Each structure stands twice: as structure tokens, then as C-alpha cells.
Amino acid sequence: MATFELYRRSTIGMCLTETLDEMVQSGTLSPELAIQVLVQFDKSMTEALESQVKTKVSIKGHLHTYRFCDNVWTFILQDAMFKSDDRQENVSRVKIVACDSKLLTQ
């Protein structure tokens, strides 16, 4: 299964990358193994989001910027509101990156 490396830019992905870098620098982990861990992280995040997340959320906000490049949409919203069945969250700025899932099956 092919995966995107999108989730490496999430908070948990950046923490994992930083920790792996520290382990490689200290000699605790080989660079090859660190890469394998990141590839597995990409696969695990994709599988978890496909199978475990069932909540639907609506998003409203002011579109500041949008871009479409290499089959990837990027939207930057300002004063966005995320609303689910039981909760509402307001954020001043959010970046949404969306990829065509058909690319994963190629």
C-alpha cells in the first residue's frame, strides 16, 4: 500500500521525527531503521484514520489562500469553526491539505 508523508508534519509526526533524529545522532539507532520507523508511521496513520475515525465535522471559515499542485489541494482558512455533533471549536487560522485517495492505490 502506498502512503503519503502528510502526517509527518502533524504534532505527533514532528515529535517522532525529532526523537528519531536525536537517536540517530547519539548512535542509538541507525538511519536506515529510523527511515523504516517513519514509513511504518505513515502506513499506521493512514490505516488508523481509515478504520477508526468515524466522526464527521463541518468546517466554516474565510478562505485566505488555496492552491492545487501535483494532485494536492492546500487551503488556508482564517477564523475557522469546526463543528461536530457535540462540540464546536474556533481557531484563528488552519491549513488543510487534501490529497486524492486514488493515488494511494496506484
Swiss-Prot record:
Keywords: Nucleus, Transcription, Transcription regulation
Origin superkingdom: Eukaryota
Localization per Swiss-Prot or TrEMBL: Nucleus
GO biological process: transcription initiation at RNA polymerase II promoter
Pfam families: TFIIA_gamma_C, TFIIA_gamma_N
GO cellular component terms given for this protein: transcription factor TFIIA complex
General function of this protein: TFIIA is a component of the transcription machinery of RNA polymerase II and plays an important role in transcriptional activation. TFIIA in a complex with TBP mediates transcriptional activity.
UniProt cross-references to PANTHER family, sorted A to Z: TRANSCRIPTION INITIATION FACTOR IIA SUBUNIT 2
Subunit structure and binding partners: TFIIA is a heterodimer of the large unprocessed subunit 1 and a small subunit gamma. It was originally believed to be a heterotrimer of an alpha, a beta and a gamma subunit.
Protein name: Transcription initiation factor IIA subunit 2
Source organism per UniProt: Arabidopsis thaliana
Gene coding for it: TFIIA-S
